[in-house]
């Protein structure tokens, strides 16, 4: 599958990216190489191969829940530029 510069520019537009002419040319070549590799992978015979998500079998690798001491309010807020009582003070985002 060959990708065109117009397709790269369209994807950039959808991603709200502003590309220079040089970047569009570079990405066209890079994406074309990636898609050529994917085409090569699609040619492989995978009949009889069990799909896997991990190279080694894994099941629910949970750790034990343990209560540990926290760092404390003074340490947590020590480098905060602004604070209000025991909270971080941040600029208002929603009017």
UniProtKB/Swiss-Prot annotation:
Keywords: ATP-binding, Ligase, Nucleotide-binding, Protein biosynthesis. SUPFAM superfamilies: Glu-tRNAGln amidotransferase C subunit. It is an enzyme of class 6 (ligase). InterPro entries: Asp/Glu-ADT_sf_sub_c, GatC. It comes from the Bacteria. Its EC number is 6.3.5.-. The keyword Nucleotide-binding applies. Transmembrane segments: none annotated. GO terms for biological process: glutaminyl-tRNAGln biosynthesis via transamidation; regulation of translational fidelity; translation. It catalyses: L-glutamyl-tRNA(Gln) + L-glutamine + ATP + H2O = L-glutaminyl-tRNA(Gln) + L-glutamate + ADP + phosphate + H(+); L-aspartyl-tRNA(Asn) + L-glutamine + ATP + H2O = L-asparaginyl-tRNA(Asn) + L-glutamate + ADP + phosphate + 2 H(+). GO terms for molecular function: asparaginyl-tRNA synthase (glutamine-hydrolyzing) activity; ATP binding; glutaminyl-tRNA synthase (glutamine-hydrolyzing) activity. It holds the Pfam family GatC. Heterotrimer of A, B and C subunits. Allows the formation of correctly charged Asn-tRNA(Asn) or Gln-tRNA(Gln) through the transamidation of misacylated Asp-tRNA(Asn) or Glu-tRNA(Gln) in organisms which lack either or both of asparaginyl-tRNA or glutaminyl-tRNA synthetases. The reaction takes place in the presence of glutamine and ATP through an activated phospho-Asp-tRNA(Asn) or phospho-Glu-tRNA(Gln). HAMAP family: GatC. Belongs to the GatC family. This is Aspartyl/glutamyl-tRNA(Asn/Gln) amidotransferase subunit C. It comes from Geotalea uraniireducens (strain Rf4).
């Amino acid at each position: 599958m060959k990708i065109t510069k117009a397709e790269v520019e369209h994807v950039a537009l959808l991603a709200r990216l502003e590309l220079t002419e040089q970047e569009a040319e570079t990405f066209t070549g890079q994406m074309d190489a990636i898609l050529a590799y994917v085409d090569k992978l699609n040619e492989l015979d995978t009949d009889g191969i069990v799909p896997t998500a991990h190279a080694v079998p894994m099941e629910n690798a949970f750790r034990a829940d343990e209560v540990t001491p926290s760092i404390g309010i003074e340490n947590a807020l020590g480098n905060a530029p602004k604070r209000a009582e025991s909270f971080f003070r941040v600029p208002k985002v929603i009017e």
